[in-house]
Structures are given as structure tokens and as C-alpha cells.
């Protein structure tokens, strides 16, 4: 891996369980522990759970360096109405651009701006279809 590519990752490559646990701890500390129920584990595990539970899957890509991330997390993700609606109707997986799995997924999804949310319909344990995607400045709450 080139030194430039290594420099965009702030932590060593870890396993997805550790990455998501670290992200949740980061989110709890920086924003609030009042947020949707973030799934732990890999993105693939989140897809499997969503398929098994017949739920849509929201994937949030977090860029700690993006100017709109703090406002989005504080005003949208941590809002009571978003939390209640999301927990009742979806499963929610989040990843940081500083983690390899989330970064790789963002490339596959052609993420061009942040904040970035994708809603997936999980058609099997390995197949998903994008139901909707939201990127850039997202207003509400």
C-alpha cells in the first residue's frame, strides 16, 4: 500500500468487529450515546441480519474530516425522531472513512460527498439493492 493511501487511514487495519466497536465508542464520546442502535460487526454481517429480519438496512458513512459531519450527527442522527423511526423500521450500520471496510464500501457505492446514507433492500445474505441514497448536506429534524 502506498504511503499516501496509508496516510488516509488513522488506525491500523483491524477486524470489522473492532472497527465498528471503535466507531460506536467514538460516536458516543464525540456526539451522544443517544443514537440509533448501531450494529456491530462487518457490513456483510449487517446485510445478513437485515435479510434474516426482513428489514431495510441503513448504512451511514462517516467522514470525521468533513465540515458537515458534526452538524449532521448532532442534529439528525442524534435526534429523538430519527432514532425512534430508525430503530422501529430499519437496521443501522455505520462506518468511518478511517476504517478499511467502510472506506472500501464507500468506493463501491461511489460516495462523492458527505454525509452519506444509503438504504438497502437485502434480497439475500449476499445481494442488496439500493432503495435510496442521500449525500451532501442533509437537512431536517
Q: Which sequence ranges carry the predicted segments?
A:
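Conserved beta-strand elements of beta-rich interaction domains across eukaryotes
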Residues: 44-45, 63-66, 97-100, 122-125, ...
Amino acid at each position: 500500500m502506498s504511503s499516501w493511501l496509508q496516510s488516509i487511514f488513522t488506525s491500523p487495519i483491524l477486524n470489522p468487529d473492532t472497527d465498528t466497536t471503535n466507531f460506536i465508542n467514538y460516536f458516543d464520546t464525540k456526539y451522544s450515546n443517544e443514537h440509533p442502535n448501531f450494529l456491530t460487526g462487518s457490513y456483510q454481517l449487517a446485510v445478513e441480519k437485515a435479510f434474516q429480519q426482513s428489514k431495510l438496512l441503513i448504512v451511514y458513512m462517516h467522514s470525521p474530516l468533513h465540515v458537515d459531519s458534526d452538524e449532521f450527527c448532532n442534529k439528525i442522527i442524534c435526534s429523538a425522531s430519527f432514532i425512534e423511526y430508525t430503530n422501529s423500521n430499519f437496521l443501522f450500520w455505520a462506518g468511518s472513512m478511517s476504517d478499511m471496510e467502510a472506506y472500501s464500501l464507500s468506493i463501491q457505492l461511489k460516495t462523492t460527498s458527505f454525509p452519506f446514507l444509503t438504504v438497502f433492500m437485502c434480497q439475500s445474505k449476499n445481494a442488496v439493492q439500493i432503495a435510496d441514497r442521500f449525500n451532501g448536506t442533509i437537512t431536517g429534524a
